[in-house]
Amino acid sequence: MKRAVVVFSGGQDSTTCLIQALSQYDEVHCVTFDYGQRHRAEIDVARKLAMQLGARAHKVIDAGLLNALAVSSLTRDNITFPGYEDSAGGLPSTFVPGRNILFLTLAAIYAYQVEASAVITGVCETDFSGYPDCRDNFIKALNAAVNLGMARELSFVTPLMWLDKAETWALADYYHQLDRVRHDTLTCYNGIKGDGCGQCAACHLRTHGLAAYRAQPQAVMASLKAKTGLH
């Protein structure tokens, strides 16, 4: 039996990864991390989506220590979220140092216990917003380290790594789930489900990606298929 663990926040990217994983694996588990994020609604959104989409299990893991160690606008009310115009150059205030190092390592431990062969994460280098822990070389390096430390072959799978946001929307549409991803996920830094606030950097990427897909759906879908091998 092919099993996978999806690092699941309830946002656009991880939900799209979950949708695809459910079509590719016999059993899919979700792990969501409670790290003291400002908008707790994302945990509730993740719970609901995991159940609705049919994940075998959904585990919420306490990662509160990250909040104590890493200062970020995602965890501190007194730090302002960046707008899109503020996101160019340098690390944005939304960067949480060590977040993906911790999340992927904990997800790998869970995968070890349930005998999963893959940990799936929605990180993307094309739209990575300056986060160093979303880069392909980082994911591969951590994957190698985890495999050495656990003496077991586990794959860190990144379906969105080389896709832009338009192609990520196309991927959701490929599985006939675009409307669910649009209306039921929470990506907005200001904690607004669906189309979000429209002002933060996350909403800008999401909104402009959807507009780009809708403007040229056939071309974007063809690009997606060329990159991923989907038919």
Curated annotation (Swiss-Prot):
The protein's GO terms of the molecular function aspect are:
ATP binding; ligase activity, forming carbon-nitrogen bonds; zinc ion binding
- What biological processes does GO assign it? queuosine biosynthetic process
Tell me where on the tree of life, at the top rank, the source sits. Answer: Bacteria
Q: Name the InterPro entries for this protein.
A: QueC, Rossmann-like_a/b/a_fold
Give cofactor(s), names only. Zn(2+)
What Enzyme Commission number(s) appear in the record? 6.3.4.20
The positions annotated for binding Zn(2+) are 188, 197, 200, 203
Q: What catalytic reaction does the record list?
A: 7-carboxy-7-deazaguanine + NH4(+) + ATP = 7-cyano-7-deazaguanine + ADP + phosphate + H2O + H(+)
Known Gene3D superfamilies for this protein?
HUPs (3.40.50.620)
The entry's keywords = ATP-binding, Ligase, Metal-binding, Nucleotide-binding, Queuosine biosynthesis, Zinc
Which residues bind ATP per the record? 8-18
Q: In which pathway does it act?
A: Purine metabolism; 7-cyano-7-deazaguanine biosynthesis
Cofactor notes: Binds 1 zinc ion per subunit.
Q: What does this protein do?
A: Catalyzes the ATP-dependent conversion of 7-carboxy-7-deazaguanine (CDG) to 7-cyano-7-deazaguanine (preQ(0)).
The Swiss-Prot or TrEMBL record describes its family as follows: Belongs to the QueC family.
Its recorded name reads: 7-cyano-7-deazaguanine synthase
The species this protein was found in:
Sodalis glossinidius (strain morsitans)
User: What gene is this protein a product of?
Assistant: queC
